[in-house]
A protein has these predicted regions:
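Extreme N-terminal starter segment of soluble prokaryotic enzymes
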Residues: 1-5
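Active-site beta-loop-alpha junctions enriched in small/polar residues
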Residues: 6-10, 33-37, 74-77, 113-115
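Residue-level preference for long, well-ordered alpha-helices that form the structural scaffold
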Residues: 11, 47, 51, 85-89
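Active-site acidic/histidine proton-transfer and metal-coordination neighborhood
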Residues: 16-17, 21, 56-57, 61-65, ...
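Glycine-rich, positively charged N-terminal anion/phosphate-binding segment
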Residues: 33, 42-61
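Short glycine/proline- and charge-enriched loop/turn segments
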Residues: 38-41, 122-124
Length: 124
């Protein structure tokens, strides 16, 4: 078993600084947010897919701090009643899956949070 943290908890910090903090705290793996309600502070999958060097930079940072990727995640509501909002969530999810494939990550997490949208300040 490995201790993992959802990196969006440190979204205000640059990814390198967040990884350093987590490694010093004994964390061994990270779940990286890639869109949806928590945002894309450390990883915008569309941007990473368009610029593969960003993938290399992220993987190098993780290696530097001896961290693994537990999962990529995008917590959005792909069945949102507003079609434009739903489409953005779908795009984030699709790009996250494609990015996971490129990065060799075998776990992608998606959760709509439809029951508790107030936790992420979204207006349904």
């Amino acid at each position: 078993m490995k201790l993992s943290v959802f990196a969006v908890l440190l979204a205000a910090k640059p990814f390198d600084e967040a990884c350093k903090y987590l490694a010093n705290a004994g964390v061994q793996a990270v779940e990286i947010g890639c869109g949806g309600f928590p945002g894309k502070a450390h990883c915008d999958p569309k941007e990473f897919l368009a610029h593969p060097e960003k993938i290399d930079e992220m993987l190098a940072t993780l290696k530097k701090y001896n961290l693994e990727i537990a999962a990529l995640s995008t917590h959005g509501n792909c069945v949102h009643p507003n079609p434009e909002v739903a489409r953005q969530f779908e795009e984030d999810y699709e790009n996250t899956i494609l990015l996971a494939e490129k990065m060799g990550v075998d776990t992608v997490v998606n959760s709509a949070f439809a029951i508790t949208p107030h936790l992420f300040h979204c207006g349904f």
